[in-house]
Amino acid sequence: MSREKFSLPTPIFYPHRIFSACVGAQFIAPLSRKGAINRAPTPGFQKMGVGKKNSLTLKLVRGGEGFGFCPMVGYNSFMSRSGIITLTSDFGDQDSYVAAIKAVILGIFPEARLVDISHQVPAQDITHAAYLLKSSALYFPAGTVHLAVVDPGVGSSRRAIALESQGHFFVGPDNGIFTDFLGPESRTFLLNRPEFFRPRVSATFHGRDIFAPVAGHLAKGADLESLGEPIFDPKKLPRPEPKVLPDRIVGEVIHVDRFGNLITNIPSELIPSRSTIRIMGKDIPGLSPHYQSAPAGVLLALIGSTGLLEISLPEDSAAQRLKAWTGQAVEVLFTGE
């Protein structure tokens, strides 16, 4: 598309904003009244490459002050989005908290597809929420936004963050809930731009007033960098690794699901074909292929859907039978070839 087609009155500039773009044209530089390329005084235009050819065009609108480019605060079309927002919280389903969060998101992005991972996280159990995210988030399409609110530090000095990792976006408190997505390639930003929040922010409900609107803007196409400043020290939860000794592997229970299965931190590839699994003084001979491989009431060990060693009790709860919970030691004893 030629420059002459953009020979309109001087555009209205919106400082510190990136402008909406759509696929189609090749020139995005604004023009002066004489048709010369203006030097755009905004980070948004600089970021998009003023004066350079691109496969993008900007939407021109006419306002009270003349022609200009229609702005969408912090938005661009370079980052793909799936339109999906997942929700994880400890809010349960008897109160209106989850509904309020969804209402805020839909007010910003009515086309969003909202998927509940779980709202039954035990109250303030950050580790539990982190496990749910780790075991589900990356099954969603790239460009999905994952909103997680298990936030015992709400209203305190704990930071609010958004991050990008492995093609996905995460929004929530900086309390370790996103530990498993923090790596060398991830990018984390402090949420400190109030224009992306609700007008009035409650000290007790950042899920509704900060995280929900940010998630809505991200899913709609907001640029991650526009949400705040980069940080390089997001909080991480401790992640105990199994210890491999000459005669055994020593690990621990990291999650208990609603069936009472004890999920450990021992991956399948570490477990030899001949072994005995020991927990709380009880020995389980070898691995079973599935949950019904032993009679009802008999403990068994197997590799679960996450690829980790589990202790299960057919038709009952292994956690209740053993009175075991997260942190409980589990050993895999090597019994020879």
Label every model-predicted segment.
Residues 6-8, 14, 29-31, 39-44, ...:
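Short, low-complexity intrinsically disordered segments enriched in A/P/G/S/L with frequent Arg
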Residues 5, 18, 34, 47-48, ...:
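Polybasic, lysine-rich low-complexity intrinsically disordered segments
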Residues 198-265, 270:
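Anionic-ligand-binding alpha/beta catalytic cores of soluble enzymes and soluble regulatory domains
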Residues 82-120:
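N-terminal glycine-rich anion-binding loop in soluble enzyme alpha/beta folds
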Residues 84, 108-114, 125-131, 140-143, ...:
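Active-site histidine-anchored catalytic micro-motif
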Residues 263-323:
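A conserved acidic, glycine/proline-rich C-terminal tail/linker
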